[in-house]
Amino acid sequence: MKKIFFTVCSSLLLTLASCGVEKVYYASDFGVVPGTGEDMTQEVALAIETIKAECDGKPAVLVLESGEYDFYPDSANVREYYVSNHDQDNPKLVAVALEGVRNLTVKGAGEGYANFMMNGRMLPIAMVGCENCKLENIAVDTRVPQITQVEVLENDVENGYITYRIAPYANYRIENGYLVVYGSNWNFVPGWGIAFEGDTKRIIYTTSDIGLGTSGVQEVEPYVIRAPWRDHRLVPGSVIAMRSYARPTPGIFVTECKNTTLLNSCVFYAEGMGLLAQMSENLTLDGFNVALRGDDGRYFTTQADATHFSGCKGKIVSVNGLYEGMMDDAINVHGTYLRVVDRLDDNTLVGRYMHGQAYGFYWGGEGDSVQFVRSDVMEITEGNRVVEIAPYDKDQLAGCKEFKIKFEKPLPADIANGKYGIENLEWTPEVYFAGNTIRNNRARGALFSTPKSTLVENNLFDHTSGTAILLCGDCNGWFETGACRDVVIRNNRFVNALTSMFQFTNGIISIYPEIPDLASQTKYFHGGDGKGVVIENNVFETFDAPIVYAKSIDGLVFRGNKVVQNNDFAPFHWNKYRFLLDKVVNVTIEDNDFSTGFDEQKDVMYRY
């Protein structure tokens, strides 16, 4: 796969244009040295504060030798952060806090990464209100992950018992017959898991999320457990990532920043997203990986998405990355709908964050262009502009769930009937996702929900287990905006997606807005204005039928693609059509190569 050079050139030009000669600082001069096992939290904080004071925003580089740097909760930077799509438990224990920093590069030097190792539940890196900052050759990991890996040694299917070996990094104890895993400041009983093939590290066919044998257990010998657990799919040698659904912190948190770059850096493990960026402008990922270390035997990386962008604007560039083994998607780009809960006067309403993992952070400001959507039919009704906005249920932004918003134009009389959401169009990004490999992960590959131009090209989607690419939009459950107007998916290779079922996984490419009352919808959610979604010159290697599922879109092109049928797995998906189209118009399917032939009468189904 060709390497994408776009971002390196762009970053270089940005650096030359905005920066003078960089002043270089060496972390070792502040006592920050690798491989000691000692806590480096305060030493790193001193280095950052010194650079801020001495450089006052002028260009600087903080250089760390390659190797492992340990951080501990007891001396962490204690912060109140509200992180989109994460558990809103505070305070956060932060290892490295970059706050209000300008024109700083934190760089690992030498062979390998400068690897920040967490010793307990912590937020490894926070970038808050920064501008023109870069992480280069930096990695994030933890000594004892909250995901506990086990290997199946014996599966007594007849009697309903499985014997498994717990990975040596894990801490565990048995309490009242329950397997309790723990770290220095956390403990729980794993309830769900993801099963991997021992030899390929791919998720086992048709397993999705599995229940676990963590109750009524017996210790056969240290780290070997026998449990009542009936699942014939888990043959000896299978590897299970035992987990919860908790998302306390991402690996890297970026909020209200501008011109942020992650270059040749990696998240090996995080108890939430690998990278979570919210309400930030212009983000570049080049050679950023969420990947296995390869030297410790782990099959998993992050507890949730590899990268996640909530309410960002400008341009998101993600190229030359490797995303593998995560418990959710490689990338998700969206905004956040507020629900209208009260109409105070003709121009003023109350909008509320609705999801329990998305509130407490900046949503928009004066002058922002917005549009309203009816959540039951997902129809955009009209636009408006913000005149004033302030927290309504709290005195401050942090932790607030409601905003009082005054608009330029009068509001409809029925705006507060519980059916309307508000989308902020100012905070919507253009996206370029290219030259990446996504493999062996749970759920889906890539999610995009933005009205701006989105180009997805030259990527490899390899055994993503669910849908490879999802275009969504949901003002009912996740409350993630919005409609896609201009998406091009080209020159990608898709290998055996859809080996398991997850939410929204109706095709290898699934265009799936959440619309409770599709039958009553009179407008189309995605597409329009002569654009829509173009899928061209891709290769689909698949064992099953569904290629594209689409719902409520005006403008869908599937052109010049190659579909190669294989027998790697038995077909199982409920969707037996190549193209299943619900309320879709202006469709073009042409000049494609299907290895088993194409019959439009049998392979295409229009509904509604």
Name each model feature, range by range:
Residues 118-124, 144-148, 249-251, 271-276, ...:
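Short glycine/acidic-rich loop motifs that flank beta-strands on beta-rich extracellular proteins
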